[in-house]
C-alpha cells in the first residue's frame, strides 16, 4: 500500500482542518481504512432493521442514515481522490449531506445491505489508493 504524505494546510479548505488533524494524528491513514470495515461490521452487523432505525433525537439521523451517509461519502471521496490523483486543478464542489440522506430513502434498505455496500466501496477506494503515483500523492 502506498503511503501518502499528510497535506499542508494550504491544500484544503479551513473547514476541513479538524478532520485532517484527527485523521493525521492517528498515523498512517491508509493503514486504518481496512480496519474500519471490520469495526463497522462488529458494531452494526448484528442489528435488526428495526434496531437500525433508532435515532438519538427527532432531528438526528438513524443508524441506517449514518450508514447511508458513510456510503455516500465513500463515493464522493472516491471521485475526489481520482481528481486529485490526476492533478485536476478545477474546483471540487461540496455536497449537501442532509439532502443526500433525505433523498436516499434509507429506511427501506436492509442494514446488512448498507454494511455490505460500504465494504465494497471501501475496498474499491483502498485499491484506488494503491495506484496513485508518488508524484500525485
Model-derived regions, located:
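Aromatic-glycine hotspot motif
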Residues: 1-63, 75-137
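Histidine-centered divalent metal-coordination motifs
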Residues: 69
Amino acid at each position: 500500500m502506498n503511503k501518502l504524505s499528510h497535506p499542508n494546510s494550504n491544500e484544503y479548505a479551513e473547514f476541513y482542518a479538524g478532520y485532517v488533524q484527527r485523521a493525521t494524528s492517528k498515523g498512517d491513514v491508509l493503514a486504518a481504512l481496512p480496519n474500519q470495515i471490520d469495526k463497522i461490521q462488529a458494531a452494526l452487523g448484528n442489528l435488526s432493521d428495526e434496531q437500525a432505525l433508532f435515532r438519538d433525537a427527532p432531528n438526528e439521523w438513524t443508524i441506517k442514515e449514518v450508514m447511508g451517509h458513510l456510503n455516500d461519502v465513500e463515493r464522493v471521496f472516491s471521485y475526489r481522490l481520482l481528481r486529485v490523483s490526476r492533478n485536476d486543478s478545477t474546483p471540487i464542489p461540496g455536497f449537501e449531506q442532509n439532502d443526500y440522506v433525505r433523498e436516499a430513502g434509507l429506511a427501506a434498505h436492509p442494514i446488512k445491505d448498507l454494511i455490505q455496500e460500504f465494504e465494497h466501496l471501501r475496498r474499491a477506494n483502498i485499491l484506488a489508493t494503491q495506484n496513485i503515483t508518488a508524484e500525485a500523492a
